[in-house]
Amino acid sequence: MTEISIDTARGITLAATLCVPDTADPLDLPELSTALEAGRTAPARHEGAVILAHNFLADRHGLAHRLDELAARYRKAGLTTLQFDFSGLGESDDDVITLAGEIEDIQAVCGWLADRGFARQAIHANGLGATATLLARPEQV
């Protein structure tokens, strides 16, 4: 489990947790960041990634830690998981919660994963997180 930060286009920093399953190749995030800054492309990952998008006024763990439980099941199936706090919620920046902001958050998270070699992505979303996901229509998903 790795705690990460993802910056959105409007300069908001999202708090997130990335978990790579034990069966996957290790992921060296500092090395990847250096490569991306140098303009190199990240190697493709063979496993997919599932983004877990929470409901309104919840956080990346979900109510009663339900998203943590779902993430563990996805990892057991060999998938990387990324759980994040929408802007204005949990440990993410901002003090305003809008649907437009959540749409941008989804796009930033999908882009962050794609930049790190995760071409295969799925989103498991609840409530307003599902609405934002459908409206965001990220091309990686």
Model-derived regions, located:
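N-terminal cap/lid segment of alpha/beta-hydrolase-fold proteins
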Residues: 1-48
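The alpha/beta-hydrolase serine catalytic core
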Residues: 3-5, 11-14, 97, 131-141
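Short, surface-exposed "cap/lid" segments of acyl-processing enzymes
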Residues: 22-32, 43-85
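Active-site micro-motifs of SAM-dependent methyltransferase domains
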Residues: 58, 88, 130
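Short glycine-/acidic-enriched loop or helix-start segments at secondary-structure transitions
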Residues: 62, 93, 133-135
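Alpha/beta-hydrolase active-site loop
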Residues: 66, 96-116
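Glycine-rich "HGGG/HGxG" loop immediately N-terminal to the catalytic nucleophile
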Residues: 84-97
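Primarily recognizes the serine-hydrolase "nucleophile elbow" in alpha/beta-hydrolase
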Residues: 108-141
